[in-house]
Amino acid sequence: MSAVSPFKLPRKTPFGFGEKVIEKVSGLSKLDAIYEKYAFSDDSFEFANEVLVQLNTRYEIERGSIGDIPKKGPLVVVANHPLGGLEGVILAALIGKVRQDVKVLANEMLSRIPQLARLFIGVDVFETKSSRSTNTRAVKEAHRHLSEGGVLIVFPAGEVSSWQSGQNQITDKDWSKSIGGFVRRSQAQVLPLFIDGVNSRLFYQAGRVHPLLRTLLLPRELINKSGKTITVSLGDVIEAKELNKLDNDKCIADYLRLNTYLLNSSRNGDSTSINGDENRNYYATPVMDAVDKALLAKEVEELNDDDLLLSQGDLEVYCVSSNRIPNSLMEIGRVRELCFRAVGEGSGNASDTDEYDRSYLQLFVWQKQKHDIVGAYRLGITKELIQQSGIEGLYSRSLFNYDSAFLNSMDDSIEVGRSVVAPAYQRQLQPLLLLWKGIAHFVAKNPKYTHLFGPVSISNDYSPVARQLIASVMTVTHYDNEKAKLVQPTTPLAPSNNTFWQSDMLSSLGDVGLFSKVLSRLEKGPGIPILLKQYLGLNGKLVCFNVDPAFNDALDGLIVVNLAQVDKRTLGKYMGKENAQRYIQRHQH
């Protein structure tokens, strides 16, 4: 036991009166009583566990398990900082169950406790004359520890969570970019952890008066957690090579913070897929039976050679007006409804066909041996549709409010949508590729068309918070702000209480691969929707988001692709090298 308690202030006032008052108000005196009463172990990890017992505070793992913690090699553990001191003890106890080579970079006040001195690397959070040298030594020690293959626990905010007026919530302030330096230099794995905790109202009110008052009350916040259970969520380990794709240390800090806070969103009510039992009545009407294959084959056989866009093995790609293939259109509608229901969308009808199908072209992939509709797309020639039915003849106009100004911004355009691949062929890459090749070959035959546009769906298989995140990231990184001024949603996406992120935190997610990893971790499965990814690969830009009540509240993004600005190599992948060369030369200005 230390001769001088770490919870007693140096006596500078007469009889120590002032210090005693501060100790009582702040809660230091109660911590001192606990510290003096019990014979704590000198072992740092045992001490951490004993402190939790004496404070009558528990922690439980709500997501992940200690088995997810890498057992060797340099590891940086990043966490939010909601409580101010207790989380350091909790994480030391938690990580200590798996690794003994642990250091915690935290407030130096904790490192003054003898039993924690060997475990904590103290940082001076006050801007004093000595803080620069103290913190420089701390950073060097942290780097050295990682270079030796150890675990470093860091709270990158550097101070306890507080009211952030810009975000209108209690949360961490911006994370220090120094966390990026630790990761980049050590090439360590990173384990994000989210700690679900909150301090008293008095604590936050005091902080709004002056940060020092908040600091003064931190010991009291340790004590008032008695009888409470703090939940901890462990994320998936993030490899250094993933973080190496980010531009700088600030981007790394933002990326890690996003992945950490998403652990909270992933376990609350906003995380569940919309596609659930509540939608069973929506699908009360069964999907129609498959159309007789003989009828389909007869229709395809009667098509002209000019209707065939391309063929590959037993697969052929056609594009024809709907009135020429009534049976095939019924089968396409059946396949649409079957597939869209599987991801929480669908019209709820026996077949997904509508009044727009009659005036649109149907592009489809045909399996000539099995007589199957493999996949399909719907194409609308914008000017022709407007001539026939006005602007309301465009399907996208039922979802988004726009006028001729938006359409004129795209020159000659084709509205595309209702993309689908039949269930039996969804594990193959070829069908979707052939659909895109079909569109490209159609454009090559009709090279005046420069733009594709239409709704791309984010299905209800994605949780609400994932849908919000997709919309937010796309708005920051893949958005045409000028065209967006010309479009309004008919049913806007409602804001969520879980949109903790700010736009600058999302700016590094323009890399589709990185963002897909974030989504995959959040959803424990799918990354970016495959069709959206395809559009982005063609430099597609979103201009608006809308919820479609007639399609089981699917979230649609209105996307625009300028084919004339797609690079020749990418365009050649779909259109063919020579076709792409001619097309690009035609549209060069």
Task: Annotate the PLM regions.
Residues 1-81, 88-90, 97-101, 117-118, ...:
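Membrane-anchoring hydrophobic helices of lipid-metabolizing enzymes
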Residues 2, 136-288, 501-509:
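Non-catalytic C-terminal accessory region of glycerolipid acyltransferases
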Residues 62, 72, 76-78, 84-91, ...:
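Short acidic (Asp/Glu) patches
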Residues 99-106, 360, 366-392:
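Carboxylate/His-rich catalytic cores and anion/metal-binding grooves
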Residues 103-134, 139, 146:
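Conserved nucleotide-cofactor-binding alpha/beta core module
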Residues 281-323:
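Conserved N-terminal entry element of GNAT/NAT acetyltransferase domains
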Residues 309-366, 372-375:
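Short amphipathic alpha-helix that is part of the acyltransferase structural core
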Residues 337, 347-350, 384-541, 546-556, ...:
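Acyl-donor binding region in acyl/amide transferases
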